[in-house]
Amino acid sequence: VGASLYDPINVYKCQGPDIGVVDGPFEYLTIAGVKLPLPFTTRMTVVRLSNDDLFVHSPIKFAATLAEELRNLGRIRHLVSPNQFHYAHIGEWSKVFPEAITWASPRVRQRALARHADVTFTRDLEIKPPEAWRQDIDQMLFPGGYFKEFIFFH
C-alpha cells in the first residue's frame, strides 16, 4: 500500500474561528545529497490575528492558488519556522510576500546556511511572544536537547 495525502492539498481548511490548516504535497528527506524514498506529508497552520494579519506556521511548498486564497483571509504577515526542520519553503513565500516577517527558531539559521537554503530570516523567536501576536497567540519553547521547538497556543 502506497502513501496517501490528506486531500485536497493546497486548500485552506477551516478548523475553527480564525484558524485553519493547509495540507501540502509530499516531501522527501535528503541525506548527504541522496533523496530517500520515504515520503512524508506536510501541513501548515494559518491563524488570522485580531488585526487581520495572518500567522503562517511551517509554510508548505508555495502555490499561487493557495496564496490567493489566503490573501482573501487577511494579510500574510508572519512566516514562522517552529523548529530547525520546518523552514524549507519560507523563502518561496517571502519572495511573493516581501513585507512578511520571517521568524527563525533556534538553530534554523545555521541549518539553512549549511544546506544553502534560499531563505533570509528577519527576526528570531524568543521565549515571550512578540507584540505582533501576543494578544492572540501564546508560545513556549519545548527544550528537547538538540531538537528545540516552539509550540504555539491560539
Which residues fall in each region the model found?
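Short, hydrophobic/aromatic-rich segments at coil-to-beta transitions
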Residues: G16-V21, F55, R134-D138
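Divalent metal-coordination and catalytic microenvironments
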Residues: V47, N83, F152
